[in-house]
């Protein structure tokens, strides 16, 4: 195995990332840098991630140019990078290999005990919980996560052990490059359908192929409560462990209750001689499901139950996953501020349910930025139904994520549809900074203010706190 690593390093020591500023790309880049590869990258955006990589010693360019790759032996591209990118064109001219992010991740995983977490929703939180438990168990894993761990402030780390924990991204089907030892499938939902020719069966088939990449002695941990997962269970031909709230699952959560910002429940698993009480430092039934998946992985690694319990009780979460930013003082109104990455109707519904169960007597004021024209079009009716359950709704313009506009698909159209189907009267604003002038006339004392979306709406919490605390 060491000989194979040396061959790879001798031939591919200089690695250049096009689009290095994303969480997935930066995580792989950081691990490779810490393995003493020469890492460079380009990204038109400067952010905390690129600043961190630069401080570590990576060469970062904030403009795409063919000269950026003059020393590169391999080019790694994110799914957002198109074939007409100047650096990609030059690489092809020079016969420099151009590989997708997941193929480089697969190469890292090939030399380790890989644990890959797949699913339309919940990947980042599940990956983070598994990582946290292994850290508490002093197993020192390598991890690459699509979000920032609140406990450490980072999304990737090179560990000393053979364990590598990573998210498996189905959005471009690149997760099929991965060959882990253990895997999780949290759910299968209608999203990124352009990749799958708008055919839901193609999406399900991809998850079946993903599970087939496991060795015959591996295991796939799957959420049997999810309809999409249930539909492929009989097509999985690897050792299988199911989890959920329903009877008949291998790992089952029972006796669920919420106290403040924590969830309490018991776990039934035939590997345990008795029910195991869990205190989870997160809210929401969706996070209980994420936790059950993590427990399934950790049982396969023979981590003791007392360590799992301890880790879950002090897990501090992931950035932009129901982040609580304290209270804002807006015209003497005390408003609790939450921020979440949710951008799919089912994710939004889970966040709404969690907050409404926690703050049953308070209004939910929601600021949402739709993400991608195609997703807004494909899930339009679901967005209308889900967003209509907010008490107050403010919509930002759709964040395009490099997509071209689609006729009649915009936030105003979405707002009009919500007005027709409910008593809600959404407000549409063009610029996130306009929120500062809008909020004082909207919020009441003790409202819950929720920021939602995967685009540049992430700037809002700091903007609001700098003006209203």
UniProtKB/Swiss-Prot annotation:
Q: What is its main location?
A: cytoplasm
Q: Which GO terms describe its cellular component?
A: cytoplasm
Query: What's the superkingdom here?
Result: Bacteria
Could you tell me which InterPro entries the record lists for this protein? Answer: Mur-like_cat_sf (IPR036565), Mur_ligase_C (IPR004101), Mur_ligase_C_dom_sf (IPR036615), Mur_ligase_cen (IPR013221), Mur_ligase_N (IPR000713), MurCDEF_pg_biosynth (IPR050061), UDP-N-AcMur_Ala_ligase_MurC (IPR005758)
**What one GO molecular function would you report for this record?**
ATP binding
Gene3D superfamilies noted in UniProt: Mur ligase, C-terminal domain, Mur-like, catalytic domain, NAD(P)-binding Rossmann-like Domain
Organism (species): Ruthia magnifica subsp. Calyptogena magnifica
What keywords are assigned to this protein? ATP-binding, Cell cycle, Cell division, Cell shape, Cell wall biogenesis/degradation, Cytoplasm, Ligase, Nucleotide-binding, Peptidoglycan synthesis
Q: EC?
A: 6.3.2.8
- Locations listed in the record: Cytoplasm
GO terms in the biological process aspect are: cell division; cell wall organization; peptidoglycan biosynthetic process; regulation of cell shape
Q: Name one Pfam family in it.
A: Mur_ligase_C
Which pathway is it part of? Cell wall biogenesis; peptidoglycan biosynthesis
> To which protein family does this belong?
Belongs to the MurCDEF family.
Q: Which reaction does it catalyse?
A: UDP-N-acetyl-alpha-D-muramate + L-alanine + ATP = UDP-N-acetyl-alpha-D-muramoyl-L-alanine + ADP + phosphate + H(+)
- What residues bind ATP, as annotated? 119-125
Q: Outline what the protein does.
A: Cell wall formation.
Q: What is this protein called?
A: UDP-N-acetylmuramate--L-alanine ligase
User: NCBIfam families, alphabetically?
Assistant: murC (TIGR01082)
Q: Does the keyword Cell division apply?
A: yes
């Amino acid at each position: 195995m060491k000989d194979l690593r040396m061959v790879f390093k001798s031939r591919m020591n200089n690695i250049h990332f096009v689009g290095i500023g994303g969480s997935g790309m930066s995580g792989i880049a950081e691990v490779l840098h810490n393995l003493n590869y020469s890492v460079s990258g380009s990204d038109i955006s400067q952010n905390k991630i690129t600043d961190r990589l630069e401080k570590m010693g990576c060469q970062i360019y904030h403009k795409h140019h063919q000269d950026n790759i003059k020393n590169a032996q391999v080019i790694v591209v994110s799914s957002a990078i198109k074939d007409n990118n100047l650096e990609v064109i030059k690489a092809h001219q020079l016969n420099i290999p151009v590989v997708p992010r997941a193929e480089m991740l697969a190469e890292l995983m090939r030399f380790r005990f890989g644990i890959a977490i797949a699913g339309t929703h919940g990947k980042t939180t599940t990956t983070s919980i598994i990582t946290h438990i292994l850290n508490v168990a002093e197993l020192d894993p390598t991890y690459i996560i699509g979000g920032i761990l609140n406990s450490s402030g980072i999304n990737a780390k090179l560990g000393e052990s053979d364990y590598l924990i990573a998210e498996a991204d189905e959005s471009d089907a690149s997760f099929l490059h991965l060959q882990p030892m253990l895997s999780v499938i949290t759910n299968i939902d209608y999203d990124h359908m352009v990749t799958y020719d708008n055919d839901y069966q193609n999406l399900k088939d991809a998850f079946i192929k993903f599970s087939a990449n496991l060795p015959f002695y591996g295991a796939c941990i799957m959420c049997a409560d999810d309809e999409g997962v249930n539909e492929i269970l009989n097509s999985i031909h690897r050792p299988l462990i199911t989890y959920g709230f329903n009877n008949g699952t291998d790992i089952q959560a029972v006796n669920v209750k919420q106290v403040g910002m924590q969830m309490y429940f018991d776990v039934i698993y035939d590997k345990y001689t008795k029910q195991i009480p869990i205190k989870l430092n997160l809210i929401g039934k969706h996070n209980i499901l994420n936790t059950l998946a993590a427990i399934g992985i950790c049982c396969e690694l023979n981590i003791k139950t007392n360590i799992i319990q301890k880790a879950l009780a002090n897990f501090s979460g992931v950035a932009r996953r129901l982040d609580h930013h304290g209270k804002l003082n807006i015209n003497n109104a005390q408003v609790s501020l939450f921020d979440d990455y949710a951008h799919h109707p089912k994710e939004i519904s889970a966040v709404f349910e969690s907050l409404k169960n926690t703050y049953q007597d308070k209004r939910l004021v929601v600021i949402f930025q739709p993400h991608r024209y195609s997703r807004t079009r494909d899930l339009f009716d679901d967005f209308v139904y889900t967003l209509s359950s907010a008490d107050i709704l403010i919509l930002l313009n759709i964040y395009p994520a490099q997509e071209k506009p689609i006729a009649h698909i915009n936030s105003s159209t979405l707002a009009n549809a919500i007005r027709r189907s409910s008593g809600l009267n959404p407000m549409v604003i063009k610029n996130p900074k306009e929120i500062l002038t809008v909020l004082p006339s909207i919020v009441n004392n003790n409202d819950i203010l929720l920021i939602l979306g995967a685009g540049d709406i992430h700037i809002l919490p700091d903007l609001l706190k700098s003006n209203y605390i």
